[in-house]
Amino acid sequence: INKQLAILAQKFGNNLLAENNAFEKEIGVPVSSYPTFMTTCTDRAKREAAFKAYSSRGNHDNANDNKAVLLEIMKLRTQKAALLGFDNSADFILADKMAHDAKTVDTFLASIMGPAVAKAKEEVVAMQKIMDEDIKAGAVEAGAKIQPWDWAYYAEKVRKAQYDLDENQTKPYFRLENVRNGVFKAAEKLYGVHITSVSGLPVYNPEVKTFRLTNADGSLVGIFMADYLPRSIKRGGAWMTNFREQYVDAEGNDVRPIIANVCSLGQPDDSLHLLTIDEVQTVFHEFGHALHGFLTKCRYKDVSGTNVARDFVETFSQFNENWAFQPEILATYAFNGDGQVIPDSLVVKINNSLKFNQGFMTSELCAASILDMKWHELTSDTDWANFDVAAFESKVCKDMGLIDEIIPRYKSTYFNHIFNSGYNAGYYSYLWAEVLDKDAFEYFVQKGIFNPEVAKSFKETFLEKGGSEEPMTLYRQFRGADPDPAALLRARGLIQ
């Protein structure tokens, strides 16, 4: 079963890569540029075409169709779970995670989905008011209502109106190379590591940059490889990967890790690689994963660094995002071509805007998490031969209360995370980990965001331990209490 699953996962990924390339040929922009296109394209018909092409990837009944592939994957996963004595694949997968079972995850996601959808409905009202003005001006057909392909475009208009924030104002201050240096500065300030550029190391592509991380005494922490630029053969998304993990060898030597962050940031035709606010957060996010791998001090590689429970692994990446727009860190990297540091007024607007559109953002993420869980709560007696993927998705979305203007962040036929990347019954982990991340950051805020004692405790309690101890035990040691889920809702502006 495992061999068949590995082959099918690879096929799913290959099909999706082909579909991504087909999307670019049809629409004229790469998949990595889809969010920017949907935000800036003034032609509603083109936005609709792009949305429909994007949201139907892997679902064209052609050689790259993923419906049959994912159904075979689920059939085998349910069989495997049954053989191992579990009711479904979700309970099997979650047995050794922080959540422990599907019921706990379902309850958690429902507690997030309600406030998220309520906020999203408010956001629709605000966008519709602006669309109505476009209707009066003749720019949009009479009677038009906000559709999924309108959301990014009109959300940006609302953001400009409510926060007077235009990404064209911020991007000149977020040059990729400078943002990367800002990420490094934050790590140096928090954890005492020193990061320097190094040349002459073997790389798999000329665009990859290499860096050496050292402790204050000069001892090696690890080697970092930064692969941030879009390429035609690179799949979408962003991730951290280990070329070598930390461990102690048979002779007692501490073997240090080699880690890469891989992304597709900026526009292919932009030589300065100016980043959006979301892309800046991505750079901080992925380096949070890297720090988890670099700062670990474990004997065995199987529990070092990011080798932790799936619903714990995103804690440190998301936690690292909290420093992206702190004034002290912005001063180290956010300056334009003339060397001018980003003005305080713009920083205030950025931080105010971070809670903007969170009804949508949280709803689409939570919806994808619920879709993932419902797939993996299916049992081995499911009638796979007559299974209708579209009908299943529609019912799941209706049952969770998702509004028509939003679709899950990933639909099944291009949900690479759960069918090819090990996040099966685990996509909820981003939200689960965010509870820990936001609760921990609230503690930092109380004590001072660069408080050396708190940072030292965080490093020694969490980052150095990897997966060698129960995550909740470690969290309680650091925080002195269980994480508060309301911290996530507060951080996203879903509650006061």
Regions flagged by a language model, labelled:
Residues 43-57, 96:
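Short, charge-rich amphipathic alpha-helices with coiled-coil/heptad character
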